[in-house]
């Protein structure tokens, strides 16, 4: 049986933790002037992937 391939795009975006998969939040790349400082600060925080998306990410990261 051949080795399973890791999806490199997913590997760069998600990190496996004890509680699930950690990810960066969206909406912090451009058009930042109209967003408040508080909103941008909260968007810097990492969050966990939703429970519905975990199986798909786990399939793409077989060795995580």
From Swiss-Prot:
Gene3D superfamilies per record: 4.10.410.60
PROSITE patterns cross-referenced by the UniProt entry: RIBOSOMAL_L35
GO-annotated cellular components: cytosolic large ribosomal subunit
A GO biological process held by the record: translation
SUPFAM superfamilies registered for this protein in UniProt: L35p-like
Keywords: Ribonucleoprotein, Ribosomal protein
Keyword Ribosomal protein attached: yes
One function term, GO molecular function aspect: structural constituent of ribosome
Family statement: Belongs to the bacterial ribosomal protein bL35 family.
Name of the protein in question: Large ribosomal subunit protein bL35
